[in-house]
A protein has these predicted regions:
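Short cysteine clusters
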Residues: 88, 113, 135
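A domain-level detector for eukaryotic transcription factor DNA-interaction modules
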Residues: 94, 108-123
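Compact beta-sheet-dominated globular domain cores
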Residues: 116-155
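N-terminal "domain-start" segment
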Residues: 2-110
């Protein structure tokens, strides 16, 4: 009787360990899920000010990333990561805009890439634009919604 009871307790304990492990994994996925769209946005649209704006070339940028290879046009923004991180913050750093659109008050440098008719490369246009961002349900920027050109940038 005691051997059976100990065996049942051991198997019950194994089940609880498995259930708790799965719950921990699920919680981690939910907590870090927000970073996926943010990281993907940054990877696809962000140009770091650590390099000069005119050093960025569409032909290189569009071929560097697998996700952009088949796109006929794309928009890149030249701004600090810190500034993008603060776009969805509503006053207090804990309070974030969620599932809403936010126009940035200052114009940003924007690089637009358009595939040429012969598909051999990309034409680029550079300008200062007001940018409307979408703040996702996680309270972080996940897309560029709209652009309003203020002034073209000539080489």
């Amino acid at each position: 009787m005691q051997v059976v009871l100990v065996t049942e307790m051991a198997s019950s304990l194994k089940i609880w360990v498995i259930v708790l492990t799965l719950l921990c994994i699920l919680c981690r996925l939910l907590v870090y899920r927000k970073d996926v769209s943010w990281r993907e946005f940054m990877k696809q649209h962000h140009l770091s000010p650590s390099r000069e704006f005119n050093e960025y070339k569409c032909n290189v940028l569009m071929r560097e990333q697998e996700a952009l290879k088949d796109k006929s046009s794309h928009v890149f923004i030249y701004v600090s990561e810190y500034k993008i991180g603060g776009i969805c913050i509503n006053g207090n750093w804990r309070d974030r805009y969620r599932n809403t659109y936010v126009w940035l008050q200052n114009a940003l440098k924007v690089l637009r890439c358009h595939q040429e008719n012969d598909n051999n490369g990309y034409t680029e246009s550079r300008s200062f634009d007001y940018v409307e961002f979408h703040c996702g349900t996680d309270g972080h920027v996940d897309s560029i919604e709209d652009l309003k050109m203020v002034e073209p940038i000539s080489d």
